[in-house]
């Protein structure tokens, strides 16, 4: 969530500072996240932790400055950072005609230990394909000479 947020903020910084960014379950609207937690944590002592978002940059307001391809990944039942964040950011990317890829993990929550085999297969194959196609990296490490497509195989849950 914070790593995804940081990636999206980085995507709008100095041109060519990065080749591309991958944002998983990113907070795209800090105020929306604060409101979400205030509703969920009514009266909780954890409310003080929300102060970190008070002066945060909103990636939503920075989309016009995005200067690298963006891979946005989000689970559609994320309990920590609602998928609304991804949907709002995706709409802004489309409106601004920014290069992007969106992968929504159906039935996936926020944390990797809640992902099933089919989620992980789609997640990792999407990342590898994105790195090869959009970032010029093969296998996520070296410049691509001839990118190899990895087709995700989705396993059926019993």
Segments from the language model and where they lie:
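Active-site-proximal cap/loop segments of hydrolase catalytic domains
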Residues: 1-158
